[in-house]
């Protein structure tokens, strides 16, 4: 027997089931800071200067969750700094500035020697012959600062949706950032400056690389990037001769994402892209000494591009040589599970990256070309409970930035969640799928859709005509309604279970139906050969449900595999019964039926 309830049940999603950003705030981020420290960490002076140069009046400040404790004081300091700058003014309209006068047919429209109309006509005013009133100069408008504290997506991306709610002119993004290009608003990036134990970092470096001629690239998280030049100078003074450093640039698709490699003099070094024809420095001969824990997406992207990667942990004393081979193996297993998926869901996890719409279009076309069905859904923060509502989906692909597209803790998800790069490998045939170790997480690597050329369209029509002629010849030879293409297709097996999969390409099976219709139409012609009257067996796999004439694998799943499809749908399954009059009356006595016996209550 179930225990007695002492409180009302909790119907909301537990907090531990939410998908949260993996960065844990360190002690130096949560302790109290002075005003001077906040000015330095959040770069108040530089931010105010850029806002003043841009002439922006409505400023949105986007803080990650662990920095919200500093938001009120940052707003006060920024407003005080902005107050010392000249206030922006709203420019007067072009009509007011250009209104002049020549001649007016209606003298009654004048007022004390001035034009009372002030109407813009071809840039000369109304033509009354009187001087138009001088435009009134607008008063300076005070700047408004807003805190954007509820980011629906990953904290590394600029939340343009929240900024548009306050009609912001510019967004100031604080903390770590993926530096993905935005589509609408200008952005001021403030990575914030964190304290680094320089002596401990130098000791770890010398212990890991005792050889003074070791080829190493110094790299740091964006919050520690300010310490890289000084560390490089001190290490070179200690005798290291083959050291390089990195600087932050806005280039997620770089050989090192959002970084350029520079020498001791700050000159950029050309990097080879790994191909045989490319020239420049080969990063596979260099190790990377990374300050602070990088995101997992960066680790996977770098593991095949550099010799090895050493991570210096700033939040603890543990530092080690990192290997991503096991994690890459798990990612490869995830994408293999989608090779036989018939229905793929597209999760839109960003609305701010500039090319997300074209990337969605490309992914849809890739899925359709493979004979599979796709459904697009816009979500906020991902969690297993959201995706579990769609049992029809065999797997998911995330459309987001190169950091947030990777779902690290995906053990709780019922279906695999992969990146667009992994989807491209999953849709490839077994002969074409080659795993080289390269990996990418975002939509930057999605190939744009290829526009159809007129010549290609014409050749495609010729191929369709030839296919119809061939189909007519097959029908004349007695093949009936069977689709030879589907019969000749090789069987597909699930790589995990080894079972035969018959529904991995549902849209390709649906596309074979119009061919059969064309065959029937061609047989109605007078000169067409007579159709065979013999009965043929049609495969049930080709009988898919359709919605408004469009084949829908989701509707097919609802029809064949759902045990409950809504209220009132079980009326046909239960046998109907004749309505009979029941017992009636009052508590003193009841009557069974219209003329039934009366039962008295004792």
UniProtKB/Swiss-Prot annotation:
It comes from the Eukaryota. Residues 445-537, 576-602 are annotated as: Disordered. Belongs to the DPH1/DPH2 family. DPH2 subfamily. Residues 584-594 have a biased composition (Gly residues). Required for the first step of diphthamide biosynthesis, a post-translational modification of histidine which occurs in elongation factor 2. Dph-1 and dph-2 transfer a 3-amino-3-carboxypropyl (ACP) group from S-adenosyl-L-methionine (SAM) to a histidine residue, the reaction is assisted by a reduction system comprising dph-3 and a NADH-dependent reductase, predominantly cbr-1. Facilitates the reduction of the catalytic iron-sulfur cluster found in the dph-1 subunit. Pathway: Protein modification; peptidyl-diphthamide biosynthesis. Keywords: Cytoplasm, Iron, Iron-sulfur, Metal-binding. This is 2-(3-amino-3-carboxypropyl)histidine synthase subunit 2. One of its GO terms (cellular component) is 2-(3-amino-3-carboxypropyl)histidine synthase complex. GO terms for biological process: protein histidyl modification to diphthamide. It is found in: Cytoplasm. Component of the 2-(3-amino-3-carboxypropyl)histidine synthase complex composed of dph-1, dph-2, dph-3 and a NADH-dependent reductase, predominantly cbr-1. Residues 480-489 have a biased composition (Acidic residues). The keyword Transferase does not apply. It holds the Pfam family Diphthamide_syn. It comes from Neurospora crassa (strain ATCC 24698 / 74-OR23-1A / CBS 708.71 / DSM 1257 / FGSC 987).
């Amino acid at each position: 027997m179930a225990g007695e309830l002492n409180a009302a049940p909790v119907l909301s999603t537990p907090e531990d089931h939410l998908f949260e950003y993996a960065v844990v705030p360190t002690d130096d981020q949560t302790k109290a800071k002075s005003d001077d420290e906040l000015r330095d960490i959040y770069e108040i002076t530089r931010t105010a200067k850029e806002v003043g140069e841009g002439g922006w009046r409505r400023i949105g400040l986007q803080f990650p969750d662990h920095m919200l404790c500093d938001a009120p004081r940052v707003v006060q300091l920024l407003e005080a700094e902005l107050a010392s700058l000249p206030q922006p003014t709203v420019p007067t309209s072009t009509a007011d500035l250009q209104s002049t006068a020549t001649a007016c047919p209606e003298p009654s429209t004048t007022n004390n020697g001035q034009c009372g109309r002030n109407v813009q006509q071809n840039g000369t005013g109304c033509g009354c012959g009187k001087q138009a009133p001088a435009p009134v100069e607008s008063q300076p408008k005070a700047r408004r600062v807003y805190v954007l504290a509820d980011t629906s997506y990953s904290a590394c991306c600029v939340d343009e949706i929240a900024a548009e709610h306050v009609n912001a002119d510019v967004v100031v993004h604080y903390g770590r950032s993926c530096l993905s290009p935005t589509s609408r608003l200008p952005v001021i990036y403030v990575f914030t400056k964190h304290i680094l134990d320089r002596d401990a970092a130098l000791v770890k470096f010398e212990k890991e690389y005792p050889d003074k001629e070791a080829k190493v690239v110094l790299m740091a998280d964006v919050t520690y990037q300010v310490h890289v030049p000084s560390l490089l100078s001190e290490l070179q003074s200690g005798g290291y001769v083959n050291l390089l450093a990195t600087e932050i640039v806005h280039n997620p698709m770089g050989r090192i994402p959002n970084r350029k490699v520079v020498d001791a003099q700050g000159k950029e070094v050309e990097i080879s892209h790994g191909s045989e024809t490319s020239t420049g420095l080969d990063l596979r001969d260099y190790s990377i000494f990374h300050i602070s824990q990088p995101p997992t997406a960066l680790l996977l992207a770098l593991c095949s591009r550099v010799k090895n990667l050493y991570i210096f942990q700033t939040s603890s004393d543990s530092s080690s040589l990192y290997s991503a081979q096991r994690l890459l193996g798990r990612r490869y297993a995830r994408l293999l599970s989608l090779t036989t998926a018939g229905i793929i869901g597209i999760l839109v996890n960003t609305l701010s990256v500039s090319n997300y719409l074209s990337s969605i279009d490309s992914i849809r076309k890739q899925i359709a070309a493979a004979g599979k069905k796709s459904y697009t859904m816009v979500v906020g923060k991902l969690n297993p409970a959201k995706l579990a509502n769609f049992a029809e989906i065999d797997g998911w692909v995330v459309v987001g930035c190169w950091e947030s597209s990777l779902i690290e803790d995906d053990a709780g998800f019922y279906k695999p969640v992969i990146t667009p790069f992994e989807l491209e490998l999953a849709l490839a045939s077994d002969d074409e799928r080659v795993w080289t170790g390269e990996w990418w997480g975002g939509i930057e690597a999605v190939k744009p859709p290829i526009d159809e050329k007129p010549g290609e369209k014409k050749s495609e029509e010729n191929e369709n005509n030839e296919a119809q002629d061939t189909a007519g010849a097959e029908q004349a030879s007695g093949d009936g309604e069977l689709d030879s293409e589907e019969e000749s297709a090789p069987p597909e097996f699930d790589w995990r279970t080894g079972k035969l999969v018959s529904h991995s390409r549902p849209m390709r099976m649906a596309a074979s139906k119009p061919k059969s219709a064309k065959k029937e139409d061609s047989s109605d012609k007078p000169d067409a050969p007579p159709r065979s009257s013999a009965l043929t067996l049609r495969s049930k796999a080709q009988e898919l449900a359709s919605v408004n004439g469009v084949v829908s694998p989701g509707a097919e799943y609802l029809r064949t595999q759902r045990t409950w499809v809504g209220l009132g749908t079980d009326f046909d399954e239960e046998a109907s019964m004749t309505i009979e009059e029941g017992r009636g009356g009052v508590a003193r006595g009841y009557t069974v039926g219209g003329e039934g016996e009366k039962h008295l209550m004792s």
